[in-house]
Amino acid sequence: LKIKNIARKMLTPKPSEFVSAQTDIFLKRLKPRPFVTDYIRGVYDNNVKPNVTDDTVTLSVLTDTHAKALASASYYGINGARHIIEANNVSDAVHLDLNVHLGDLIDGSDKPEISRGLLQFAVENYQRSKAPYYILEGNHDENDKYDEHRFFGSASFHRDDYDSLVTKYNFEQPEIHRLNPVSKVGWYDKKDIRIIFIDTSDIPYILSNGSKKYDFKKVRGVREQQLEDLTAILEKTIDKHVVMMGHANIISPSGRSALNFNGDLVQRLLVAFNNKDSGQLKNELTGDFGVNLRYDFSSTGISKVTTYICGHMHYEKNYKVSEINHIILNCSALMGKKHGLTTDYNKKWDRRYNEISELAGYFINIDPNKLRLQIFGYGAATRYVSFEI
């Protein structure tokens, strides 16, 4: 209780600050814990390193850190920010190709000044790392959880807050590409491998009397412009092994959309790409999420999308739909088993603060020569799983 009160005092923002200066000072005191970095480094040295070659792509991946201005010993809190520091510390030491965060950097339940400060801190840590990085937007990253708990429910984040703090910096790196300055689709190339990042929180920011038409935390989707951009990128993807990444799962094991809008259309587009088809992608909607576009994947050579990797669900799962592997990774954020919102998957891990089970993260190694994607988990994560690509 004393720890919580100290943290609360230090993290209380001054009125009208865009980013809380006190939050920034507090976060900059956080350091990687040697027992954690030694453990993660051991996972890399013993399990991952033997698979690394000049042709492979090796990534450090975190998802759902849910950083929050609270020094909690059993649930979401500052631990999420520290997990980023520790993962990037090891990445620097072993010279990985790419650091990826699959979204929900923050819990989005703090005052806006604090949430913006947490986002800024995380981005700055990724920027200081040696490897390039990509941070995807999660459904908590627009601070709508905070808005839900307020009586008037007005939007605490402005339209461009997240983009100005996070998204724009992804694309200031020469290794990260997009079609144009407003596209929500990014990609990274290394030799025969292409990793494409899509935004599953592609929701229009529309205000009505100060409140949002769509709650970003509750609504997930992909709009027509993003699908057009993805189509254009895929049409120019020739002789590549393609891995897709997003925050939320796009489709269920039964083939139904797992997004509120157009997850099934993303899947249909990927299947058409693998089949080298030409045709039309269309839904029955109008307005914000209506889609009607054409594609031609007949000239993409032997390119194939084999895998879609995401977080969001706070558990692990993998399944195949139309020959595409869909892989869900566990949340980095601490979820103690006594909390009501803790998933059954994390209850089984009995995750505890200041123990290895506190964290959950992954190394992913993609090998175009062995046609294999390997995932090496650490902390509250499956130690090893392999997929054909």
Question: Language-model segments: which ranges?
Answer:
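N-terminal active-site segment of His-dependent metallophosphoesterases
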Residues: 8-115
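Extended active-site neighborhood of metal-dependent phosphoesterases/phosphodiesterases
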Residues: 35, 39-45, 110-229, 268, ...
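Loop/turn elements at helix/coil->beta-strand transitions in domains of secreted/extracellular proteins
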Residues: 55-58, 94-99, 128-134, 191-194, ...
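Active-site neighborhood of phospho(di)ester-bond hydrolases with catalytic His/Asp-centered motifs
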Residues: 61-63, 99-104, 133-139, 243-247, ...
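Structured segments of extracytoplasmic/periplasmic soluble domains
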Residues: 65-68, 86-91, 108, 125, ...
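Solvent-exposed loop/turn segments at secondary-structure junctions
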Residues: 65-68, 105-108, 139-144, 200-205, ...
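Active-site-proximal segments of metal-dependent phosphoesterases and phosphodiesterases across multiple
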Residues: 205-227, 235-306
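Acidic, His/Gly-rich catalytic cores of divalent-metal-dependent hydrolytic chemistry
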Residues: 353-358, 365-389
